């Protein structure tokens, strides 16, 4: 019997976002700018948090890891997409395609867990401030961050295992700008009735668990804020949560639509647009969201600029 993971297709061709040459040039300039802002913004967040003692707190530790994950997430996809905009045929071996998807899923899943951890951090800070140093000790923070990366690797392993047992013996053109699971699955000549469901269950479980943690955390946060007598205290508590809630809404909204909703509910073009949003745009927006609305980050940035340009 032929091995189940035997493939006759040796490489995949990524069709990208568009075949229009003029539009490709425009998109190249736009996405090059977005990628540059992503790298500069997230590296700035990381260096700022590491260099400023006032930002050496659990919240900013998690934010620095979120910035690192955003860099990895965007870098796993954007450079290859930019190559396609230059008019080159983007060809990836099956192994390279699987590797790209594996890396992207790892970072994407870690981001889910980090957003949940950050919600728990805000819950402890606002609802149990006297116990904050105990509940968010360096050891616990290390465990939470480590568990986020382990969870990302486990989910990525589930998706990757499903890809590796597929056979590809027909068309090799992926109608996408990266090796996304649904797009690759369409090219398989294997029975995908079960394989197509397993990753959705894995991704759906992670989304449900992390959203539950976030929802419960913010329910208690809201109750605590409403019971505050001080208007200033309420405003300060709300201001520390709005940035995180914005990031959560943007990220979870898109990944739920792509990986959990039935595929018949949207077209390939809509899938591409949503994928651009969560793989390219959101990693650029996160440092802006967290810095523009955060007084501590803005103050640390001001001091850093003064040190560099006295």
Swiss-Prot record:
Residues 47-54, 121-133, 218-237, 293-310 are cytoplasmic. SUPFAM superfamilies: Family A G protein-coupled receptor-like. It is a multi-pass membrane protein. Residues 1-25, 76-99, 155-196, 259-271 are extracellular. Disulfide bonds join 97-189. Pfam families: 7tm_4 (PF13853). It is found in: Cell membrane. GO terms for molecular function: G protein-coupled receptor activity; olfactory receptor activity. The chain crosses the membrane at residues 26-46, 55-75, 100-120, 134-154, 197-217, 238-258, 272-292. GO terms for cellular component: membrane; plasma membrane. The keyword Thylakoid does not apply. Keywords: Cell membrane, Disulfide bond, G-protein coupled receptor, Glycoprotein, Membrane, Olfaction, Receptor, Sensory transduction, Transducer, Transmembrane, Transmembrane helix. Glycans are attached at residues 5, 20, 265. GO terms for biological process: G protein-coupled receptor signaling pathway; sensory perception of smell. Belongs to the G-protein coupled receptor 1 family. Potential odorant receptor. This is Olfactory receptor 5P56. It comes from Mus musculus (Mouse).
């Amino acid at each position: 019997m032929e091995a189940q993971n035997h493939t006759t297709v040796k490489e995949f061709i990524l069709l990208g976002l568009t075949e229009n040459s003029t539009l490709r040039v425009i998109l190249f300039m736009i996405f090059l700018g977005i990628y540059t802002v992503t790298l500069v913004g997230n590296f700035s967040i990381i260096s700022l948090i590491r260099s400023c003692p006032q930002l050496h707190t659990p919240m900013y530790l998690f934010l620095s890891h979120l910035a690192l994950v955003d860099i990895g997430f965007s870098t796993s996809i954007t450079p290859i997409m930019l190559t396609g905009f230059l008019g080159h045929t983007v060809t990836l071996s099956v192994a390279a395609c699987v590797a790209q998807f594996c890396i992207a899923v790892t970072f994407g899943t870690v981001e889910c867990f980090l957003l949940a951890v950050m919600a728990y951090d805000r819950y402890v800070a606002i609802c149990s401030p006297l116990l904050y140093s105990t509940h968010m000790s360096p050891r616990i923070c290390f465990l939470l961050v480590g568990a986020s990366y382990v969870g990302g690797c486990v989910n990525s392993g589930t998706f990757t295992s499903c890809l590796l047992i597929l056979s590809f013996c027909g068309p090799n053109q992926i109608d996408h700008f990266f090796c996304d699971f649904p797009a690759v699955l369409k090219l398989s000549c294997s029975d995908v009735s079960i394989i197509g469901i397993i990753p959705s269950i894995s991704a759906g479980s992670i989304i449900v668990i992390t959203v539950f943690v976030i929802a419960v955390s913010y329910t208690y946060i809201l109750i605590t804020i409403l019971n505050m007598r001080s208007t200033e205290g309420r405003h300060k508590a709300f201001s520390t949560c709005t940035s995180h809630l914005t990031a959560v809404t943007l990220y979870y909204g898109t990944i739920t639509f792509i990986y959990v909703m039935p595929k018949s509910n949207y077209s390939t073009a809509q899938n591409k647009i949503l994928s651009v949003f969560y793989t390219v745009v959101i990693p650029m927006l996160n440092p802006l969201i967290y810095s523009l609305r955060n007084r501590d980050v803005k103050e640390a940035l001001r001091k850093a600029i003064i040190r560099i340009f006295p």
